[in-house]
């Protein structure tokens, strides 16, 4: 049987990398996004996940065997994050029910599973590190948990297997997608080089000195494909990172060197929203 993938969020960093990988490996790939993915081998589908009727209409005739949920929508509060993002997962999994072909659904979440939502990110007592997949949930409301609950309920109802993938900060190539730390830092460094401004670290003292890691979109795509096609990986959660642990105080000077500029010493908070407030014309 030919594997038919439905990649939700196909124009994003993760979704576009995954769509290309699956198409290259001979999968039939449908890419769902508000801004359709036009890569070779990907059938574009334009739909809004919060509109159940329009979503069902857009998916008419699509019979996915494997679904990859790689998108989310940030809202003004965690309560809204929970409501909106849970509804997006619920609507999608309801829309594919009539086809009756789904065998596996993969959900991409992330580090906030362990550190808490935006409103409480990294505050209070942190869980034991390194983070392990079997660690229990934090005692806070979290839209990642709401997404998981929708996935688990649908899997029990419809009989498909699932996997949850928890990357750290994801970097990769996605044309037109601004939610990409690599692109953001490249633009910021380029502006600093153009204007002669100091290349200041925009994060906190804790971030500067703490160990961290990242996830390459290609690495995550390969992991998603593996989990979706490996029976032993069914019904499990996975942390997915590159494995090269670093500190920003070490990395910052290396980014500066790449762009031919000097790295400024850490001198307190310097949010990019403030540093780049007047840079629209550059």
Give the ranges of each region predicted by the language model.
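Glycine-rich Rossmann NAD(P)(H)-binding loop
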Residues: 172, 203-211, 238-245, 256
């Amino acid at each position: 049987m030919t594997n038919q993938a439905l990649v939700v969020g196909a124009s994003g960093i993760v979704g576009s990398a995954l769509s290309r990988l699956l198409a290259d490996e001979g999968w039939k790939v449908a890419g769902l996004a508000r801004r359709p993915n036009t890569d070779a081998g990907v059938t574009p589908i334009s739909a809004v996940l919060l509109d159940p009727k329009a979503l069902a209409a857009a998916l008419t005739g699509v019979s996915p065997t494997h679904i990859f949920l790689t998108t989310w929508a940030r809202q003004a509060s965690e309560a809204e994050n929970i409501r909106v993002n849970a509804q997006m997962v619920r609507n999608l999994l309801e829309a594919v029910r009539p086809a009756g072909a789904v065998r596996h659904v993969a959900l991409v979440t992330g580090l906030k599973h362990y550190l808490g939502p935006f409103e409480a990110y990294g505050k209070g007592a942190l869980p034991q590190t390194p983070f392990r997949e079997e660690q229990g949930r934090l005692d806070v409301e979290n839209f990642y948990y709401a997404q998981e609950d929708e996935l688990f309920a649908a899997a029990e109802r419809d009989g498909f297997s699932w996997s949850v993938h928890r990357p750290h900060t994801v970097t990769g190539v996605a044309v037109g997608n601004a939610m990409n730390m690599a692109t953001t830092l490249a633009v910021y460094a380029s502006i600093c080089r153009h204007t002669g401004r100091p290349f200041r670290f925009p994060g906190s003292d804790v971030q500067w000195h703490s160990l961290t890691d990242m996830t390459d979109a290609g690495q995550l795509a390969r992991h998603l494909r593996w989990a979706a096609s490996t029976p032993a990986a069914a019904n499990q959660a996975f942390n997915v990172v590159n494995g090269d642990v670093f500190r920003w105080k070490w990395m910052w000077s290396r980014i500066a060197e790449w762009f031919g500029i000097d790295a400024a010493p850490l001198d307190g908070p310097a949010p990019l929203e403030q540093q780049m407030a007047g840079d629209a014309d550059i």
